[in-house]
Amino acid sequence: MWQKKRPDLCSTLILSGFFLALPVQAITDYGGFRDGDVRFFGEVVNAACAVAVDSQDQTVLMGQVRSNSFTDLGEWTDPHPFRIKLEDCSTNVSQNVGVMFSGETDGKDLLVFRTGNGAGAAEGIGIGITDATGQLIIPNTAPARYAPIQEGETVLHYTARYRSTSRTVKAGNASAQVWFNLFYQ
C-alpha cells in the first residue's frame, strides 16, 4: 500500500515544482523584472462637459515681482492669463457653467488666496483670480457668474494677479495651490 501512494506523491511534488517555475520563466523571457510604473488617472463624470487633460493640472507662472513695487494695501500686479478648457460639451445636459476656486485664503484679505508656506514664504501678498470680464472671483464661494456652454468645446478665461495684503510686502516664495470645481445650470 505504501509503495502505491509513493509515486503519486512524487508526481505531485514534481508537477508542483514545474508549475511554480513557470511564472519565473515567463518573467525572465520578457526581459526581467518590472522596470517601471505606468499609472492611469481618470474619472467618469455625469456632467455637461469633461475637463480637458491639459486643464486638469496647470501651472501659472507668476514670475518675479519686486517687494518694493507695492506701496500700499490692496495694490495689484499685472495679470497672468490662464484658461480652463472643457471638451465634449452637450447643451442638452446643461446650458451654463460656473467655476468655484477653492483653497486657503490670506488671513488679512479673504478675497485672495494665501501665498507661500513655512520658512522663506513671502508675507503681505496673496493671489486673486478674475474672470473674463475682470470681476474678482471670491475664493471658496459658489459661482456668482455662469458662462454659456458651447456645443463641443468651451474655453473659460481667467487671470491671476498678486495683491498686497499689507502695506509692507516681505520677499519670499509666493506660490499657492488652488482647486476648481464646475457647477452647471
Named regions from a protein language model:
Residues 2-11, 17, 22-185:
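Mature extracellular/passenger domains of Gram-negative fimbrial/pilin and adhesin proteins
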